[in-house]
Amino acid sequence: MANKSIKKFAKIDLEELVRKSETLLANIQFASIDEPVKTVLITSTGPDEGKSTTALALATAMAKAGKRTLIMDCDMRRRSQGKLLGVHPAAGVYSVLSGRAPLKKAVAKTNIPNLYLLDCEPNIANPASVLASQRFAALLRALSRSFDYVVVDTPPVGAFVDAAVAAALVDGVALVVRQRVSKKQAVADALAQLKAADARILGLVMTSVPQEKSDYYYYYNEENRRVKKKHSDGESATLQQTPAEEMSLGLDEDDMQAWARRIGVSAEDLQEAPKAPVRHAGHAATPNASAKKASSSFAPGSFKG
């Protein structure tokens, strides 16, 4: 069972965390009244603050509410969602962005109804550049058309620029801080970095989840060369190195339509959707006709939990 795997790995009560995340979901839904929030990025000021478990709990709460939800692991330096869920897809984010795998092959069902996973490969060089690519932005747009919610798990904004880069592309950002652990100045710096990236900050999520001492900083080493990590459940995972020739692979060098065909989505789904009109008192929003179209081969009906 996926739930047992989560509890064993994270040493947490998932059900309790999901219940608490329902409040976060309610706040996100409230924030969506005027400006829709479908893509949510979860980051933290530093390591071991409960970022990834919070992202999973929020995604699970969304799925339990009957929403087709995708959790997207974009922490290419220390991925964890596949391990937490006990799901190991054949391909990940980078395979899709490079056009080597169709989106259908990369998106995997989980044991939680309505919840899907798009994992990431380990040891990808220059993760921030990958997240800043035109293809990543287009992929997010395609996913937001196929799912009710997309939850993006990124590295801590206080340690790497990855989160700030991706924060500008999503509908909203939640910053995880750990009670009695996160420093006030670190939180202020993280918020300033997100604001500088023009991110829409939904709020702070305070956690106090007990976690074992980890080697997160070592795992996030400068050269990104570490290939083995001892997990908290005693299992040793061997990570594959990314071949040098793949590291320089450009993600914007060819025609976007050709790439769309390779990953199995329509070019129209990669285009930026028109902004929905803002609701004002006494006035109803008029749906945009183009937003109603379901033209992608990666349509909502493609994956049914």
What are these regions (language model features)?
Residues 1-305:
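P-loop NTP-binding module
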